[in-house]
């Protein structure tokens, strides 16, 4: 199916139908996977001048996150300041980077999005927000959708959704309601 065929009247990509046969037959040899993963830490790490480059790249992929029950606008502001300068200036100079690395985003609860957007103004660092009943995803769909709307209206550029894990454990893939959660909400 082409992208043109999946677009709706609102210009939204409608997604593709769920084909569980793509993964229903997949099997994992758990003991082999565990053995293989245990060897990952013994493998040769990135060395010398490549190490710094990969560490900088890791910083650029990280979302600095605060999802504490006692978050405050001040705590979020401090996190945003760290996001603007994730590496000490002397290290940036010593590495010859020529610029301060930028984190991928700052991620906060929906009620803290405005504080983060304000603190990051002019920095080009996007604000992400968890939504849809973090951390368990056990709230009704209308409430999860409203949480997304609230975060986007407050300035969130990215929404990290939480799925209802029971649907996965029970292999109820259509119960995940992912198409309902796609932005823009319908």
Task: Show the residue positions of the predicted features.
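Short His-Asn-centered micro-motif
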Residues: 106-110
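Alpha/beta enzyme core
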Residues: 49-57, 70-101, 111-186
């Amino acid at each position: 199916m082409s992208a043109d065929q999946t677009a709706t009247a609102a210009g939204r990509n409608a997604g593709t139908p769920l084909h569980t046969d793509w993964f229903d037959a997949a099997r994992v040899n758990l003991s082999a996977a565990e053995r293989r993963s245990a060897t990952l830490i013994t493998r040769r790490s990135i060395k010398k001048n490549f190490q710094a480059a990969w560490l900088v790249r890791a910083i650029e992929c990280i979302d600095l996150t605060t999802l504490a029950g006692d978050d405050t606008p001040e705590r979020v502001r401090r996190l945003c300041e760290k996001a603007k300068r994730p590496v000490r200036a002397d290290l940036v100079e010593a590495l010859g980077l020529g610029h301060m690395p930028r984190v991928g985003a700052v991620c906060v609860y929906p009620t803290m999005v405005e504080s983060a957007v304000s603190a990051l103004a002019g920095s080009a660092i996007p604000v992400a927000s968890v939504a849809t009943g973090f951390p368990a995803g056990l709230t009704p769909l209308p409430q999860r959708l409203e949480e997304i709307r609230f975060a986007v209206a407050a300035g969130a550029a990215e929404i990290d959704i939480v799925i209802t894990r029971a649907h996965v454990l029970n292999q109820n893939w259509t119960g995940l309601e992912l198409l309902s959660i796609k932005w823009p909400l319908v």
